[in-house]
Amino acid sequence: MKRILAIVVAVLLLSGCSGGVKIEADESTFLIGLRNNCDCEIYKVHHEYYIGDKPIGGGYACNADGSAIRSGDVLVKDFICADFPEGADLSEFHIEVFVVDGSGKEYPCGEVLSLDAAYGNVYEIIITGNYEGGFSSAWSES
């Protein structure tokens, strides 16, 4: 329940309900914002993450009411120490992203993304595209 509350608060803060408050990760967490810049309605973002080539975990980010994720909205995934094996080398972190339509069908968003991750940092993935032309994901330049 504590993690769900943290995710909801982070989503609200990053989506503009923050009143100007900046999102920060504490020293035992890093955050990845998943920004929807797609040209169509998507309902969930599925992610799978790895250390090197080893699958570690995954999950879904979506609106609590099941509604479409609006263009420009940011959903946040927090990563804590317990999400990784002891001694995991976060410089070998990789994440794969998929969008999910209203019927539950998943669409890949390009290649697996690499990140030299570190606790205490906030990162953002920009998701673009549509069902006809395909989707892509890339790290934000900012």
What are these regions (language model features)?
Residues 23, 32-39:
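Asparagine-centered strand-capping/turn motif at beta-strand->loop junctions
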Residues 88-102:
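A short, solvent-exposed beta-strand micro-motif common in secreted/extracellular proteins
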Residues 1-4:
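Positively charged n-region of N-terminal signal peptides that target proteins for export
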Residues 18-21:
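Bacterial signal peptide processing site
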